[in-house]
Swiss-Prot record:
<dbReference type="GO" id="GO:0005975">
    <property type="term" value="P:carbohydrate metabolic process"/>
</dbReference>
<dbReference type="InterPro" id="IPR048458">
    <property type="entry name" value="MalQ_N"/>
</dbReference>
<dbReference type="Pfam" id="PF02446">
    <property type="entry name" value="Glyco_hydro_77"/>
</dbReference>
<dbReference type="GO" id="GO:0005737">
    <property type="term" value="C:cytoplasm"/>
</dbReference>
<comment type="similarity">
    <text>Belongs to the disproportionating enzyme family.</text>
</comment>
<dbReference type="Pfam" id="PF21226">
    <property type="entry name" value="MalQ_N"/>
</dbReference>
<dbReference type="InterPro" id="IPR017853">
    <property type="entry name" value="Glycoside_hydrolase_SF"/>
</dbReference>
<protein>
    <recommendedName>
        <fullName>4-alpha-glucanotransferase</fullName>
        <ecNumber>2.4.1.25</ecNumber>
    </recommendedName>
</protein>
<keyword id="KW-0119">Carbohydrate metabolism</keyword>
<dbReference type="GO" id="GO:0004134">
    <property type="term" value="F:4-alpha-glucanotransferase activity"/>
</dbReference>
<keyword id="KW-0808">Transferase</keyword>
<keyword id="KW-0963">Cytoplasm</keyword>
<keyword id="KW-0328">Glycosyltransferase</keyword>
<dbReference type="InterPro" id="IPR003385">
    <property type="entry name" value="Glyco_hydro_77"/>
</dbReference>
Amino acid sequence: MTELAPSLVELARRFGIATEYTDWTGRQVLVSEATLVAALAALGVPAQTEQQRNDALAAQLRSYWARPLPATIVMRAGEQTQFRVHVTDGAPADVWLQLEDGTTRAEVVQVDNFTPPFDLDGRWIGEASFVLPADLPLGYHRVNLRSGDSQASAAVVVTPDWLGLPDKLAGRRAWGLAVQLYSVRSRQSWGIGDLTDLANLALWSASAHGAGYVLVNPLHAATLPGPAGRSKPIEPSPYLPTSRRFVNPLYLRVEAIPELVDLPKRGRVQRLRTNVQQHADQLDTIDRDSAWAAKRAALKLVHRVPRSAGRELAYAAFRTREGRALDDFATWCALAETYGDDWHRWPKSLRHPDASGVADFVDKHADAVDFHRWLQWQLDEQLASAQSQALRAGMSLGIMADLAVGVHPNGADAWALQDVLAQGVTAGAPPDEFNQLGQDWSQPPWRPDRLAEQEYRPFRALIQAALRHAGAVRIDHIIGLFRLWWIPDGAPPTQGTYVRYDHDAMIGIVALEAHRAGAVVVGEDLGTVEPWVRDYLLLRGLLGTSILWFEQDRDCGPAGTPLPAERWREYCLSSVTTHDLPPTAGYLAGDQVRLRESLGLLTNPVEAELESARADRAAWMAELRRVGLLADGAEPDSEEAVLALYRYLGRTPSRLLAVALTDAVGDRRTQNQPGTTDEYPNWRVPLTGPDGQPMLLEDIFTDRRAATLAEAVRAATTSPMSCW
């Protein structure tokens, strides 16, 4: 590879773009010039020529000196924090704080700063340093600067140094089900699992088996077709939503909406449900489009029913709470029904929330916009009800929300938040052991510079929404709050690079919002991770994630040796498997290798991969025998092996244990195969039993296998831990 120009290397360094990285095999990889130029362009920095790079370096320096205050100051409670101000050289600088509660504090102390002044277009700018006191309360405050006739203000965010676990989990462990909600149909749902099903699953697992939470797939909003069907088929992946702040109306239970009782012709709603249920019974995959077509028709009928005065007040309060973001989301949904679901192809007057034609469209389509606002209100009420029921049933946490990494590039958030999302690149992951071609998630990443300029408000709102009706949140690929793999448009995932984020700021804001909500934060920290990152998460009191198949003893013994239970992390959520692998029964049989081989995803010979899978299985069976969870001699059947593996989890010190619902009922089919789109029915696989026959929610409640596994994990989490 051609040596990179020093100016390009320096420019990349200033903007947090890696010029080299260590891959999953430990090999040092140099990033190409084309990738660096594309990443800089996504940050608004032209860097194709030497002149452009030199101009950009000069502009970056000038921008630093022209800014009176930092864009945002994020600090930890109990620590003094120093920051710099820029004023005309020699001019006084009066600095004070205004706290979130309106209180003013003046004890912002100036300290020595001997930096020489800077000539900014003939005006000499001086730099002074100030220190914020260590005793500031948690919250969102402001620091103000006055110098002569000039004034400036910046956000100060004081975050918890340590989040940890809430009092309700003090000294205790908890177990819960990990569920892909869409796959869990009931006899009352509309061909797809919904929020009433979620509430009932929580009630059963808590009251019958002492579960402390239900971890559910991201419930984020998807792009849904309108009456004219202008949109493409519904994107099945819950990890590629149109919006992460708002919720998917597919998860509504129509019959749980209070106004339904006042609908004059309720028989039509019943017929719609019956028809879609019969259609679903004939398929071996989830048909979201048919489910939504029926549900949308019913919801339109209910939306027209007059509401009581009290209900109108509740709706108005919801709209006030959600503000401009709700209006933008509902507007995008109505626009997508009219012009299609790719806002880049809309008329130019509609391609931005503030564009000239948007307000006129809203006026002319007020009912369509209100329908989508109303749907979010109903979702908010049903989510609140599910969480309330879970807690009343005895759960310590209730619903554990799942926050996806990003959003669809053509969707609502990409339209509404386009000023803080990078254009011309997508987020993904470099090659690793299980995805050797890398991954492109087709999502525009946050721009770290714009997040700071906007005081992290879009990110704050996202975390607040995730925790509003949840006792915990799992953040998918939490490593993306430290650095994220950016892939230039049109390039393969192997041709990306890492871009740094202010992890102190982003993790701090997550911790602050979780502290205010009394919630737990679980970071999915699998894959290629810098060694210090897991230590940092632990020091901030966030839980990590451990998957049994990935927990290997890399310090002692040969490769592939299982990590002994007592050496697992305490501050983590542990499970046997994940949605990107087959359920445990399938994994034990080597299904993950055969599936990837059939899809052309292997980079090694299939026999070598199968032999590796057999060796992994043998190593874990030997470990289970070593600790007495399997008897010597006869080979265990699938159910016995799965039960023993989850009992092994119970011997780890992990504070949270997760049981995949697919494992509880003996399912074998993979929910998602990374590296594929239409080649495999990702996120469209309904829950089935070991015989491959569909399993409804009501069947789970009486299933012997599910009860046995639940009780085994319950016993493990309630027994004394010798390693504590």
